[in-house]
């Protein structure tokens, strides 16, 4: 027994997660579980309500007032990026591009969207004036302002979840 080494027990732990995917053909698949996740639900809400924000503004004479041009820019810019990120996560393409720090990208995207949408929503709400503008524009801009604040809350929640994901990966 003198030449024997002390015995060490090795414990191996494996963690598996079930990803429910449906293949739509050759290399395109989508992740159903993403649609049920908080991130997926928030992205869908940001896309739907963001579309309402810029559609309601686009249907009015927003180009006559620079404040509404700013709101339109923020709404369309972040709507396009939200659609991009939604498709990226839905198809799990982000897992195939490993060189990009996706948790940091998500945090920067959602944080900037929250700040700029908050500014745009406040600017839009303060620019709506029933006495000066036509009735149709007033209704559209009021509704758009309401939805802009809803999108702002969605981006704030997304920023929180992105921060949590970034903090756990750092």
Swiss-Prot record:
One Gene Ontology cellular component: nucleus
Gene Ontology biological-process entries: myelination
Domain spans labelled MARVEL: 34-167
Record's bilayer topology term: Multi-pass membrane protein
Membrane spanning stretches: 39-59, 68-88, 103-123, 146-166
Keywords: Membrane, Nucleus, Transmembrane, Transmembrane helix
Segments on the Extracellular side according to the record's topology features: 60-67, 124-145
Highest rank taxon of the organism: Eukaryota
Cytoplasmic-side segments: 1-38, 89-102, 167-170
PROSITE patterns: MARVEL
Gene Ontology terms for molecular function: structural constituent of myelin sheath
InterPro entries assigned to the protein according to its UniProt record, in alphabetical order: MAL, Marvel, MARVEL-CKLF_proteins
Cell compartments where the protein resides: Membrane; Nucleus
Keyword Membrane annotated: yes
Database matches in PANTHER family: CKLF-LIKE MARVEL TRANSMEMBRANE DOMAIN-CONTAINING PROTEIN 8 (PTHR22776:SF10), MARVEL-CONTAINING POTENTIAL LIPID RAFT-ASSOCIATED PROTEIN (PTHR22776)
Protein name per its UniProtKB record: MARVEL domain-containing protein 1
Organism per entry: Xenopus laevis (African clawed frog)
Gene symbol of the encoding locus: marveld1
């Amino acid at each position: 027994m003198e030449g024997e080494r002390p015995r060490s027990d090795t414990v191996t732990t494996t963690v598996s997660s079930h990803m429910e995917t449906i293949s739509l053909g050759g290399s395109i698949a989508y992740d159903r579980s993403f649609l049920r996740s908080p991130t997926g639900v928030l992205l869908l809400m940001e896309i739907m309500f963001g579309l309402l924000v810029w559609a309601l503004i686009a249907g009015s004479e927003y180009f006559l007032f620079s404040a509404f041009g700013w709101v339109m820019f923020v709404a369309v810019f972040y709507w396009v990026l939200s659609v991009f990120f939604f498709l990226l996560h839905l198809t799990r393409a982000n897992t195939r591009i490993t060189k990009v720090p996706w948790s940091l990208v998500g945090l920067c995207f959602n944080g900037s969207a929250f700040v700029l949408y908050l500014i745009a929503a406040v600017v839009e709400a303060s620019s709506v004036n029933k006495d000066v503008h036509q009735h149709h524009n007033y209704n559209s801009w009021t509704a758009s302002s309401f939805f802009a604040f809803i999108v702002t809350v969605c981006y704030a929640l997304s920023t929180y979840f992105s921060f949590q994901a970034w903090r756990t990966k750092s």
